[in-house]
């Protein structure tokens, strides 16, 4: 079983009761490492101060963790690239969720197959009128 470590950020507000329900069902944890204390926007509203070193924050929804992760990767200097998202069950079991194979989805990973790509430039796309009555779907052409 994975043991999560880190200090919670300094936050003077509340989560609006969202974590009380999450304690009965499931909650999500995001961990990251920061080189310095910095102010960041909480996905639940308000601002908090992240600690220098390891940080651990519990949130009620995975989308909130993903939003905070995007903020960590884009708004800070140096960029914080090492965040991880976990699902925490009421039993204490921890499941690692994101990034699933260790590389963020928009990055190229050795062995990751490209999905829905066409090996042509946009100017080489067929004319829509030639596809319309051909019996083929646009994604098949």
Swiss-Prot record:
InterPro entries: PsaD, PsaD_sf. GO terms for biological process: photosynthesis. Keywords: Photosynthesis, Photosystem I. Residues 111-141 are annotated as: Disordered. One of its GO terms (cellular component) is photosystem I. Gene3D superfamilies: Photosystem I PsaD, reaction center subunit II. PS I from Synechocystis PCC 6803 contains seven different polypeptides. The polypeptide corresponding to subunit II from higher plants is missing. Belongs to the PsaD family. PsaD can form complexes with ferredoxin and ferredoxin-oxidoreductase in photosystem I (PS I) reaction center. This is Photosystem I reaction center subunit II. It comes from Synechocystis sp. (strain ATCC 27184 / PCC 6803 / Kazusa). The gene is psaD.
């Amino acid at each position: 079983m994975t043991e999560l470590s880190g200090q919670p950020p300094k936050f003077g507000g509340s989560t609006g009761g969202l974590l009380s329900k999450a304690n009965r069902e499931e909650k999500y944890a995001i961990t990251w490492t920061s080189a310095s204390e910095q102010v960041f926007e909480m996905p639940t509203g308000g601002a908090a101060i992240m600690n220098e070193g390891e940080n651990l924050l519990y949130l009620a929804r995975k989308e909130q963790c993903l939003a905070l992760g995007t903020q960590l990767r884009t708004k800070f200097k140096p960029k914080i690239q090492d965040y991880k998202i976990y699902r925490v069950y009421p039993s204490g079991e921890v499941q690692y969720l994101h990034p699933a194979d260790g590389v963020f989805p928009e990055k190229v990973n050795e062995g990751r197959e490209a999905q829905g790509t066409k090996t042509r430039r946009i100017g080489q796309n067929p004319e829509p009128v030639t596809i319309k009555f051909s019996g083929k779907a646009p994604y098949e052409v």
